[in-house]
Amino acid sequence: VNAVRVATLDRAGVMLVFDGDIILGARSHKLSESKLDAFGPINWGLLGEVRIDIRFSDSAKARHDRPLQFQPGFESRIGVYTLFPGFPPSELVANIERGNIRGMVLNAYGSGNISYIYLDAIRLATDKGIAVVVTTQCLEGATLMHLYDVGRQALNSGVIQAYDMSKECIITKLMWALKRTSNLDEIQKIMHTNYTGEINVEGKLYGAKT
């Protein structure tokens, strides 16, 4: 009922309404399989709350009358890999050389840290036109890959850092980008474009406070 109430109001965008919280769709993440407050925003505040009345934060945008640009289509041939101590680069190389993926998401440590042993695999991927996106395994925070030499080398090899996007958003956005183009520069441009509040490339987290 609350979701229907919110949907009738003069607010734009995809939202998730759960347990009285109004969450930006592109920032939503399921936190628990059983709690009533099972969903929460990642790197972002609530868009609003449903109480006796409905209260929106300043970040909730009003509707507009511009025509909807509907651009369907998603590329499902991507691989998602979580790095861990001992994860062999050969696993990445094998998938790259099979030629059955067009994009890769690497869940790295901390602020997007990887080991030097993965650089050759990354270069092989980008040389073959495979988009490589690096994100953090942490639930909150952002990638800051320029902090260390190995991160800078990865960026120079064509890695696309995810900044503060959620994992769900990274995968969906990459699938959408790959359906639009095979040009790695264009894919990076799409990934770093803020369409619905899903990314902040300036490093300012928690931009929408209630």
Describe each region flagged by the PLM:
Residues 1-20, 24-28, 160-161, 183, ...:
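Short, glycine-/small-residue-rich phosphate/pyrophosphate-handling segment
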